[in-house]
Amino acid sequence: MRVRGMQRNWQHLGKWGLLFLGILIICNAADNLWVTVYYGVPVWKEATTTLFCASDAKAYEREAHNVWATHACVPTDPNPQEVFLKNVTENFDMWKNNMVEQMHTDIISLWDQSLKPCVKLTPLCVTLNCTNATNNSQEKPGAMQNCSFNMTTEVRDKKLKLSALFYRLDIVPIGNNNSSEYRLINCNTSTITQACPKVSWDPIPIHYCAPAGYAILKCNDKRFNGTGPCKNVSTVQCTHGIKPVVSTQLLLNGSLAEEGIVIRSQNISNNAKTIIVHLNESVQINCTRPNNNTRKGIHLGPGQTFYATGAIIGDIRKAHCNISGTQWNNTLEYVKAELKSHFPNNTAIKFNQSSGGDLEITMHSFNCRGEFFYCDTSGLFNDTGSNNGTITLPCRIKQIVNMWQGVGRAMYTSPIAGNITCNSNITGLLLTRDGGNESNIETFRPEGGNMKDNWRSELYKYKVVEIEPLGVAPTKAKRQVVQREKRAAGLGALFLGFLGDSREHMGAASITLTVQARQLLSGIVQQQNNLLRAIEAQQHLLQLTVWGIKQLQARVLAVERYLKDQQLLGIWGCSGKLICTTNVPWNSSWSNKSQEEIWNNMTWMEWEKEISNYSNIIYKLIEESQNQQEKNEQELLALDKWASLWNWFDISNWLWYIKIFIMIVGGLIGLRIVFAVLSIVNRVRKGYSPLSLQTLIPSPRGPDRPEGIEEGGGEQGKDRSVRLVTGFLALAWDDLRNLCLFSYRHLRDFILIAARIVDRGLRRGWEALKYLGNLTRYWSQELKNSAISLFNTTAIVVAEGTDRIIEVLQRAGRAVLNIPRRIRQGAERALL
């Protein structure tokens, strides 16, 4: 009984074990995931690259040389494309934007290049004898000085006395202030270069464009403050037209905010940080220099002419700018309200004039038709707001200007003949906040001087990204490859240098072909960069502008990006494919998300961020897999002639077989002749004379055959003899016959043995298949019985449980029904 019980328990355990094993096999039989390469996925990352310019240069002055050199830019696209990215949130930071740094460098380079061919005014650093040239009541006394000086002519030992008009701001007295001897203001601190007489300073809109392989992201949030996430993002190839206006305190001729005034600052609570105010409505400012000046040229030497103011004709009036008081006061009130929202509610906002510093910072400086104006803005920021008429800003004009792009450099601008008028739009303000302990009042003052803030006010909504068209993701598709066991050794050679493998043998060097291809491309890229640097260093000799250099760089960058992507696709065996399967299994440690979760719920940007830490590992595995595949294909091609047995029956192969057979037979016959001759020679040397080849040799008879002939004739006791073959052909035929018989017997034995082995193997294989079939049927029946038993057991348990539940419910029902009876019985008992 105990044995039977144990046997039954073991049977149940065996059934459950088989069931568990089947479930495990089904789970393991799930499809594996493999790495698949995709080309052209919408993925990007932040990058810094060389931007080039586009401009409508032909729409502006053609004769005058414009300092912005926009004639070297590419034409603007008449139909610019802007693609809006849905459900994309991107971070922007206008204070750490490489586009600002690049534009700043470009404008500096343009100014420097425009001044290179112009005249150095070092010979003018001489003593000037000056007198007051203005007597008009509207002009400050001494604003212009009539100066005479001695100048060396072409003949060095002769001097010529000349005279010219200078602004008082451009000269300083030598010695005491009452002296009539002056010098140019920058002679002891910096070199002075005269701007070319035909330079046009009017700003021309410049569009910055990204080269192929890169894109510019644009933030379209109307209240975007310049930093943080932006939810309304689009991609463009070029920015809008940006006028490179060099000004301080007031931003001129820029773009306007679309929805209310916007305050932008890197840290508004830090009073050392500049505050950029972006207006939503422009304020017009009209500036004029009414003097009707004339210009004269002073010959300094061969090919050198100094242009100065010759005379002032007519009424001399001060240069000035006019602004509508009502419009300006309304704008200032809106700015106050916007600034107040960034501080506690009880804080009062107050404006005041500049606190001091260089003339370029304390005044609103800008260029108007070639003349540099310096206007006093204290009337704009006096915080009274009582002037609703026209606000007039008094302005000064300087011809010797401190260059904003570097310290210790100055520029002399040639005087412009006639009246000068320019109309501009104020689109922004540059402010700074006072420090101090006053918690209820915040004072803001105009400032400027850092031209990066001017460019930043226009480039705040842009950023450059690099497009990453290569992406990898798991799929169920696997590349069909030539399978071969992968060797672990030899991968260390992947880290050898490009030229370091030149002395390796071909088998070892073939492993590093991938590395060599990559290093070859990087060498080309490095060489192109070196060439561009050499061109940039010699651009003054090649007469190339900064835009020409940038166009060269953009073209090279586009080729480099394309070659880089195509190189990777070629290394992975995916050339010319948009979707390329591999035989690299997907590792769940890279991402344990299911395929449906990846493809249905994630964007390519989210997916790339998730696997970005493993991208290099995946790329390396794909590369190693492709290298192994190419080695396998090479070894397979070496055995290509054995791939098809039908080639053996080709007529050309048969002729080759016959040729080999004839050579073998001829060799055997030749060897037989050689050995026969050697045997005869050996016997002759021993003194033996060979008998005729007709000699009969005895042939013994068998015991079952009588001697003599069958008729009983012939001599008894005599042995039979056989004839030796005679002649060369008979000898060759005898050898060939013996060779064929020998080959036939051994080939027959080999075929019989092989047939016996094959028959035995097939018989055993058939028996094994029958055994497996019986085993499969047995276990199928066992699984079926186990399932039936499990179903029956479950049914019994469910039935018993149901019966018990019904019984409990019946008892509860009877108890409820018997309640009135019990009450009645209790009442009767109580009455008795």
Swiss-Prot record:
GO CC terms, sorted: host cell endosome membrane; host cell plasma membrane; membrane; viral envelope; virion membrane
Lipid-carrying residues in chain (S-palmitoyl cysteine): 740
Disulfide partners: 53-73, 118-196, 125-187, 130-147, 209-238, 219-230, 287-321, 368-422, 375-395, 574-580
Region annotation (Disordered) ranges: 695-717
Entry GO MF terms: structural molecule activity
Annotated region (MPER), positions in chain: 638-659
Region feature (CD4-binding loop): 354-364
Positions in the Extracellular compartment: 32-660
A biological-process GO annotation: clathrin-dependent endocytosis of virus by host cell
Coiled coil: 609-643
Region (Immunosuppression): 550-568
Residue ranges of the motif YXXL motif: 688-691
V1: annotated span: 130-146
Renumbered residue ranges of the record's region V4: 375-395
Residue ranges, annotated region (V3): 287-320
Motif range (Di-leucine internalization motif): 831-832
Record note on modification: Highly glycosylated by host. The high number of glycan on the protein is reffered to as 'glycan shield' because it contributes to hide protein sequence from adaptive immune system.
Signal peptide (from-to): 1-31
Stretches for region V5: 438-447
Region (Fusion peptide): 488-508
Swiss-Prot/TrEMBL keywords: AIDS, Apoptosis, Clathrin-mediated endocytosis of virus by host, Cleavage on pair of basic residues, Coiled coil, Disulfide bond, Fusion of virus membrane with host endosomal membrane, Fusion of virus membrane with host membrane, Glycoprotein, Host cell membrane, Host endosome, Host membrane, Host-virus interaction, Lipoprotein, Membrane, Palmitate, Signal, Transmembrane, Transmembrane helix, Viral attachment to host cell, Viral envelope protein, Viral immunoevasion, Viral penetration into host cytoplasm, Virion, Virus endocytosis by host, Virus entry into host cell
Domain notes: Some of the most genetically diverse regions of the viral genome are present in Env. They are called variable regions 1 through 5 (V1 through V5). Coreceptor usage of gp120 is determined mainly by the primary structure of the third variable region (V3) in the outer domain of gp120. The sequence of V3 determines which coreceptor, CCR5 and/or CXCR4 (corresponding to R5/macrophage, X4/T cell and R5X4/T cell and macrophage tropism), is used to trigger the fusion potential of the Env complex, and hence which cells the virus can infect. Binding to CCR5 involves a region adjacent in addition to V3. The membrane proximal external region (MPER) present in gp41 is a tryptophan-rich region recognized by the antibodies 2F5, Z13, and 4E10. MPER seems to play a role in fusion.
HAMAP family: HIV_ENV
Other noteworthy facts: Inhibitors targeting HIV-1 viral envelope proteins are used as antiretroviral drugs. Attachment of virions to the cell surface via non-specific interactions and CD4 binding can be blocked by inhibitors that include cyanovirin-N, cyclotriazadisulfonamide analogs, PRO 2000, TNX 355 and PRO 542. In addition, BMS 806 can block CD4-induced conformational changes. Env interactions with the coreceptor molecules can be targeted by CCR5 antagonists including SCH-D, maraviroc (UK 427857) and aplaviroc (GW 873140), and the CXCR4 antagonist AMD 070.
Similarity comment: Belongs to the HIV-1 env protein family.
Stated name of the protein: Envelope glycoprotein gp160
Provenance organism: Human immunodeficiency virus type 1 group M subtype F1 (isolate VI850) (HIV-1)
Record lineage: Viruses, Riboviria, Pararnavirae, Artverviricota, Revtraviricetes
Name of the coding gene: env
